[in-house]
């Protein structure tokens, strides 16, 4: 579960290393975001020659959470940390590579590009 002020690692090659959630999109009273939800993030740590700079604001989709996701068969998939992939204004991934596994829950019409770039889909 991701909420405002949560820091996430970045799972793509945009140049950002760490981002902070500044808003969970989808309703004024919405507090938490799970895997597959879109959030507004601020870049807190970036590599010197990356595509993004520290302090910039982007949309991002949550791809891994420490809380995990429960499947229909009762299984629970948890990760060591929280991670997101940065998106542009058209909600397309900015990076050209995805690092680490992503879950099948991202296999919607909107995020098929992320699933196809990911090295492993759980």
From Swiss-Prot:
Protein known as: Large ribosomal subunit protein uL14
Function: Binds to 23S rRNA. Forms part of two intersubunit bridges in the 70S ribosome.
Top-level taxon in the UniProt lineage: Bacteria
Entry's Gene Ontology cellular component terms: cytosolic large ribosomal subunit
Gene3D superfamilies associated with the record: Ribosomal protein L14 (2.40.150.20)
Record organism: Paraburkholderia phymatum (strain DSM 17167 / CIP 108236 / LMG 21445 / STM815) (Burkholderia phymatum)
Keyword Transmembrane helix: no
Record flagged with keyword Zinc-finger: no
SMART domains (UniProt xref): Ribosomal_L14
Quaternary organization: Part of the 50S ribosomal subunit. Forms a cluster with proteins L3 and L19. In the 70S ribosome, L14 and L19 interact and together make contacts with the 16S rRNA in bridges B5 and B8.
Keyword set, alphabetical order: Ribonucleoprotein, Ribosomal protein, RNA-binding, rRNA-binding
A Pfam family the protein falls into: Ribosomal_L14
One Gene Ontology molecular-function label: large ribosomal subunit rRNA binding
One GO BP annotation of this record: translation
PANTHER family per UniProt: 50S/60S RIBOSOMAL PROTEIN L14/L23, LARGE RIBOSOMAL SUBUNIT PROTEIN UL14M
InterPro entries: Ribosomal_uL14, Ribosomal_uL14_bac-type, Ribosomal_uL14_CS, Ribosomal_uL14_sf
Entry similarity comment: Belongs to the universal ribosomal protein uL14 family.
């Amino acid at each position: 579960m991701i909420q405002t002020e949560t820091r996430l690692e970045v799972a793509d090659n945009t140049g950002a290393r760490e981002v902070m959630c500044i808003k969970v999109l989808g309703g004024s009273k919405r507090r938490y975001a799970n895997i597959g939800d879109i959030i507004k993030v601020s870049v807190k740590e970036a590599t010197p020659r990356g595509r993004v700079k520290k302090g910039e604001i982007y949309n991002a989709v949550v791809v891994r959470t420490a809380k995990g996701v429960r499947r229909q068969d009762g299984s629970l998939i948890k990760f060591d940390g929280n991670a997101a992939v940065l998106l542009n204004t058209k909600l397309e991934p900015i990076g050209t590579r995805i690092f680490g596994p992503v879950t099948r829950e991202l296999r919607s019409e909107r995020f098929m590009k992320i699933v196809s770039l990911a090295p492993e889909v759980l």
